[in-house]
Amino acid sequence: MKKYWCWVMTILVLGLLALMSNAEVDIDAFESLVKNAPDEALKAYQNEIARADLAVTDLYQLHYLAVRASARTFNNPIFIKALDMLKAPPFKTLADEDRAKILTNIGVGYRRRNQNEQAIWHYRCAMNAPASLQHKSALKVNIAIAYTRLEQPAIGYNLLKSVDREMLPSFMQAGLLTALGNATFAMGEADTALSYYIDAATHYAKDENYRAVKQVSINSLGIYVLHSDFSSYHKMLADITAEPSLIEDNQHYLGWLRELVQQLEQNKQALTVSTTMKAYSLGAANAGYASMVNAHIDKFNLSLPKVTSQLTIRDPLPVELGKAWCPNR
């Protein structure tokens, strides 16, 4: 799997070089970079927008997609700059047509930074804008994710169950299934959650979103540990380690699992909670894995108090960045 991922990244980099050398911008290649290598996409973006020969539509698409990439990579300067560019007169008609999508991407930026109230504010703005049934469904998924992170999973679950899954393309089904997995696990239904996560990974793979496959698989790891299914745990972990940035982003949660599994595989009757494990439990909770850590504490009778999510707002964005597209709020 690691060799396969390296091959995929090689193809993406070659696509990046082609993107930068062509007389016209290959928007499809750029969008693929945004999906699978957002940091590389932003490097390409900064090179491409310096060109003087770009058509207005191509330049608009670069700014629009840069918002998506920077939302995921916490690159606030580019996020704000690209949004400001979308407000410029040459792009007004195009931006007005994409109002729901732009507001959604802004909401994703806030949610990634744990500014969940701002995320919901922008998603609800987007719900009031003209959009397809599919996009409205995606918005419900995003709103549900934000409510789940605010420890209100029941609200999120009810929203998710109102979505007609069969009407959605594969990549949207993947997002819906991931959100359902998170909500159902938070409500205490581990087996159902695992089924959702596995199904989501299959849909992400169909969409060639390999990073998302690994991200949702991280959620499955904790359930495999709950079930003492260490074979599946180690197999999935080996796949995830092919994406170093995911390891870094989830280091406390993965550290918690590693320490726990090491003891469980030794068949100890009473597990020892080290200072390191305590630190990992708090870090994992703050990264959004409180319900998973608490499930492990209960399952394995760990001498550790339950943890709560103290979500840290990471690199916060200014509020209401989408106000220009949401004048009535």
Please state what every model-predicted region is.
Residues 17-68, 72, 80, 326-327:
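N-terminal leader/linker segments that initiate helical-solenoid repeat arrays
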Residues 28, 65, 98, 105, ...:
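"A position-specific structural signal for the A-helix of alpha-solenoid helical repeats
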Residues 46-50, 84-91, 124-129, 161-166, ...:
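Amphipathic alpha-helical segments of tetratricopeptide repeats
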Residues 61, 101, 138, 175, ...:
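Residue register of alpha-helical TPR repeats
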